[in-house]
């Protein structure tokens, strides 16, 4: 019997697919829809300490091979998501969910994480070090010195399972440098990758989104080769106890298969979920299982990380 079960940080999930933070996760109603779908779990919208309106609209546009967005971290604030998760873990104690977080400053990041640390939350926390769409706020994970300092400060008090969402890296030296930092800390996972920052999409003679004069994060099929490269580069470099969530360009079961082949333990769906709705989880899962049957694989462990090279 073919199984797409997986585990992260010792938590088991019935399916390796889930939503990506930012899609179908703003409201409790959306999270419930993902929870009740074929997805193995969900991650919340990336929460700041307080409610954020985000950037002015239009700020998201589906385009032929993906999407462009400059959402600006709209969310309902930490308490909205944390309270929901605390309630949910009592009702569905057999399941584990992800809480995505970011501070608008290092101080706010620590305030948020300390609140989670002091709460009864028993799930997985994802710290977003890679949002490209907040004007005036750089992507932290491109600054290795700052990343190292923040992680050192966080792990001085945070003892719950924690992972980080990363921007795409493009240089082999940067993979080496980033992995050397991450390997110093008890991270449970890294999520590769957030959207490729500051792309530009034009229709006729105009940009298609309002913020930043049309510059926005690129997602979807455009970014799959970059996402796969990041997944595999970190799979090769990170300590085995730091698992990888693959995100970027997952339209089909084949795309999910490739993420796992590159080393991903879980696969997130973003642009496709926005375009297709939660039925995408059923379709992609069935396509992935069909590939596994064809190849004689019974579990993800049979092929995870076993990408072949040409001699």
From Swiss-Prot:
Pfam families from the UniProt entry: DHO_dh
One MF annotation (Gene Ontology) recorded for this entry: dihydroorotate dehydrogenase (fumarate) activity
GO cellular component, one term: cytoplasm
Active site, per annotation: 131 (nucleophile)
Swiss-Prot/TrEMBL GO biological process terms: 'de novo' pyrimidine nucleobase biosynthetic process; 'de novo' UMP biosynthetic process
Keywords tagged on the record: Cytoplasm, Flavoprotein, FMN, Oxidoreductase, Pyrimidine biosynthesis
Top-level division of the source organism's lineage: Bacteria
Catalytic activity: (S)-dihydroorotate + fumarate = orotate + succinate
EC number annotated for this UniProt entry: 1.3.98.1
Positions contributing to FMN binding: 45-46, 128, 165, 193, 220, 248-249, 270-271
Residues engaged in binding substrate: 45, 69-73, 128, 194-195
Pathway the protein takes part in: Pyrimidine metabolism; UMP biosynthesis via de novo pathway
Bound cofactor: record note: Binds 1 FMN per subunit.
Co-factor(s): FMN
Broad class of the protein's primary localization: cytoplasm
Membrane-spanning ranges: none
Subcellular location: Cytoplasm
Complex formation: Homodimer.
UniProt similarity note: Belongs to the dihydroorotate dehydrogenase family. Type 1 subfamily.
The protein's role, per its UniProt record: Catalyzes the conversion of dihydroorotate to orotate with fumarate as the electron acceptor.
PANTHER family in the cross-refs: DIHYDROOROTATE DEHYDROGENASE (FUMARATE) (PTHR48109:SF1), DIHYDROOROTATE DEHYDROGENASE (QUINONE), MITOCHONDRIAL-RELATED (PTHR48109)
HAMAP family found in the cross-reference section: DHO_dh_type1 (MF_00224)
Protein's recorded name: Probable dihydroorotate dehydrogenase A (fumarate)
Organism: Streptococcus pneumoniae serotype 4 (strain ATCC BAA-334 / TIGR4)
Species classification: Bacteria, Bacillati, Bacillota, Bacilli, Lactobacillales
């Amino acid at each position: 019997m073919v199984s797409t079960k997986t585990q992260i940080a010792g938590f088991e999930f019935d399916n390796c697919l889930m939503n990506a933070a930012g899609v179908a996760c703003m409201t409790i109603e959306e999270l419930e829809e993902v929870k009740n779908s074929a997805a193995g779990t969900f991650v919340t919208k990336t929460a700041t300490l307080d409610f954020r309106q985000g950037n002015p609209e239009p700020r998201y546009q589906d385009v032929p091979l993906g999407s462009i967005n400059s959402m600006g971290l709209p969310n309902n604030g930490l308490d909205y998501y944390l309270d929901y998760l605390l309630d949910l873990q009592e009702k569905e104690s057999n399941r584990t969910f992800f809480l995505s977080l970011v501070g608008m400053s290092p101080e706010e990041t620590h305030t948020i994480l300390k609140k989670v640390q002091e709460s009864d939350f028993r799930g997985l926390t994802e710290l977003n070090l890679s949002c490209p769409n907040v004007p005036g706020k750089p992507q932290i994970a491109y600054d290795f010195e700052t990343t190292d300092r923040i992680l050192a400060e966080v792990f001085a008090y945070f003892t719950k399972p924690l992972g980080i969402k990363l921007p795409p890296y493009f240089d082999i030296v940067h993979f080496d440098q980033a992995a050397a930092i991450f390997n110093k800390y008890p991270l449970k996972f890294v999520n590769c990758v957030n959207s490729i920052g500051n792309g530009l999409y034009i229709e006729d003679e105009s940009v298609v989104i309002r913020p930043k004069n049309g510059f926005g994060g690129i997602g979807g099929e455009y970014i799959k080769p970059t996402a796969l490269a990041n997944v595999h580069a970190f799979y090769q470099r990170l300590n085995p106890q730091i698992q990888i969530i693959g995100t970027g360009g997952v339209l089909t079961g084949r795309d999910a298969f490739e993420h796992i082949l590159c080393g991903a333990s879980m696969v997130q769906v973003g642009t496709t979920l926005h375009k297709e709705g939660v039925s995408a989880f059923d379709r992609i899962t069935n396509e992935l299982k069909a590939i596994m049957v064809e190849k004689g694989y019974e579990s993800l462990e049979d092929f995870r990380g076993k990408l072949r090279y040409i001699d």
